[in-house]
Swiss-Prot record:
The keyword Repeat does not apply. Residues 31-58, 71-93, 187-234 are annotated as: Disordered. This is LRP chaperone MESD. The gene is MESD. The chaperone domain provides a folding template for proper folding of the beta-propeller (BP) domains of LRP5/6. The escort domain ensures LRP5/6 safe-trafficking from the ER to the Golgi by preventing premature ligand-binding. Glycans are attached at N201. Belongs to the MESD family. Monomer. Interacts with LRP5; the interaction prevents LRP5 from forming aggregates and chaperones LRP6 to the plasma membrane. Interacts with LRP6; the interaction prevents LRP6 from forming aggregates and chaperones LRP6 to the plasma membrane. Interacts with LRP4; the interaction promotes glycosylation of LRP4 and its cell-surface expression. Chaperone specifically assisting the folding of beta-propeller/EGF modules within the family of low-density lipoprotein receptors (LDLRs). Acts as a modulator of the Wnt pathway through chaperoning the coreceptors of the canonical Wnt pathway, LRP5 and LRP6, to the plasma membrane. Essential for specification of embryonic polarity and mesoderm induction. Plays an essential role in neuromuscular junction (NMJ) formation by promoting cell-surface expression of LRP4. May regulate phagocytosis of apoptotic retinal pigment epithelium (RPE) cells.
Length: 234
């Protein structure tokens, strides 16, 4: 009996010592959160937000991405879209005159940007070309045509239209001006009212060239005749 009692007491003492040792080894409550490094994210805490870039530091690529994001998020009106993203206007073939190819071009260029080259006659300076084409642009503006103008030479300018459907009407106006030598539209050159002087000068030059060639031929034939006569005398 004494031995069994002593054995039970020994077991109790060992269990108590093991429990005390376990309590000493365990960290106090809340110490895990305190010991966690502030720089390492916990599973329960959300990741830190990425710092936004200052808009003053944006480059061209950042602005392009921002514009693309706006286009995705916002409903942009059809007229504000870039030209290559606008849907093509439907062509009504019932209004096309087969005998007039220009009518087909007008329908296909509707709502599209179009450029035409205009040449001023009379060998003007760049300043004179600026003044003359400015008057033409003003007349078109008064007729409710939206036209932009760019000087590209001493006697040449570009007229740019946002709606190519009206290009041929503007061409008809320009070729009727006294100082318009010609208009180039869609690869086609249309002579203007002021282009006659160039044709006259060209005709005069051709006549003078032919006259010189004729004089040279007559001189050479005379020299040949003289040489032949000398040979016969010998």
């Amino acid at each position: 009996m004494a031995a069994s009692s002593w054995a039970r007491k020994a077991v109790v003492v060992l269990c108590a010592s093991d429990l005390l040792l376990l309590l000493l080894l365990l960290p106090p409550p809340g110490s895990c959160a305190a010991e966690a490094s502030p720089g390492t994210p916990d599973e329960s805490t959300p990741p830190p937000r990425k710092k936004k870039k200052d808009i003053r530091d944006y480059n061209d690529a950042d602005m392009a991405r921002l514009l693309e994001q706006w286009e995705k998020d916002d409903d942009i009106e059809e007229g504000d879209l870039p030209e290559h993203k606008r849907p093509s206007a439907p062509v009504d073939f019932s209004k096309i005159d087969p005998s007039k190819p220009e009518s087909i071009l007008k329908m296909t260029k509707k709502g599209k940007t179009l450029m035409m080259f205009v040449t001023v006659s009379g060998s003007p300076t760049e300043k004179e070309t600026e003044e003359i084409t400015s008057l033409w642009q003003g007349s078109l503006f008064n007729a409710n045509y939206d036209v932009q103008r760019f000087i590209v030479g001493s006697d040449r300018a570009i007229f740019m239209l946002r709606d190519g459907n009206y290009a041929w009407e503007i061409k008809d106006f320009l070729v009727g001006q006294d100082r318009c030598a010609d208009v180039t539209l869609e690869g086609q050159v249309y002579p203007g009212k002021g282009g006659g002087s160039k044709e006259k000068n060209k005709t005069k030059q051709d006549k003078g060239k032919k006259k010189k060639e004729g004089d040279l031929k007559s001189r050479s034939s005379k020299e040949d005749n003289r040489a032949r006569n000398k040979r016969e005398d010998l």
